[in-house]
Amino acid sequence: MAKVHRLMNAVLRLAAAAAAATAAVVMVTSRETTSFFGIQMEAKYSYTPSFIFFVVAYAVAAAYSLLVLAVPAGSALSRLALTTDVVLGMVLAGAVASAGAISDIAKNGNSHAGWLPVCGQIHAYCNHVMAALIAGFVALAVHFVVVMYSLHIVTDVICPCH
């Protein structure tokens, strides 16, 4: 049974790492230059702090998911990994939420604040960011499954009640 747990944990963590890395890479590669009323305008992820937070959070999540593969199941370190998984999940949720909020403003603007939508001028950039957000939500969902599975494994070690 321990081998099955270890294999399942490895598969889930590899999936989480792949999804998180994909989200970060797609966001990093989002860039477009366009002309708007004769003014050259460039859109890059690095111009928006929320997008930078997204990239850093998801890159850290990808690296962390790979590093935790080396942690032996049932050890005290695995309990620490579970706690770190929960914290990382909260960071990922915050990152995708903040990037999503900025994307919504870019797409729809905010009439109350007088902010105009910009996605009409930079379609490819906005679509690229949307793809990164979708990958981010997938990574967050997979990470949630990792947390639930890790919790199951840790509680089985503490109290094998079945």
Curated annotation (Swiss-Prot):
Summary of the tissues where the protein is detected: Mainly expressed in roots and leaf sheaths. Detected in shoot apical meristem, organ primordia, including branch root primordia, and vascular tissues.
Keyword Membrane set for record: yes
Segments on the Cytoplasmic face: 1-7, 72-85, 150-162
InterPro entries xref list: CASP/CASPL, CASP_dom, CASPL
Induction behaviour: By brassinolide (BL) and auxin (IAA), synergistically.
Entry keyword annotation includes Transmembrane helix: yes
Membrane-crossing segments per the record: 8-28, 51-71, 86-106, 129-149
Membrane topology, record value: Multi-pass membrane protein
Residue ranges annotated as Extracellular topological domain: 29-50, 107-128
Main location: membrane
Biological-process GO terms, alphabetical: multicellular organism growth; response to auxin; response to brassinosteroid; unidimensional cell growth
Domain of life: Eukaryota
Keywords: Cell membrane, Developmental protein, Membrane, Transmembrane, Transmembrane helix
Localisation: Cell membrane
GO cellular component assignments: plasma membrane
The protein's role, per its UniProt record: Involved in cell elongation in rice through dual regulation by brassinolide and auxin.
Family indicated by similarity: Belongs to the Casparian strip membrane proteins (CASP) family.
Subunit structure: Homodimer and heterodimers.
Protein name: CASP-like protein BLE3
Organism: Oryza sativa subsp. japonica
Biological classification of the source: Eukaryota, Viridiplantae, Streptophyta, Embryophyta, Tracheophyta
Gene behind this protein: BLE3
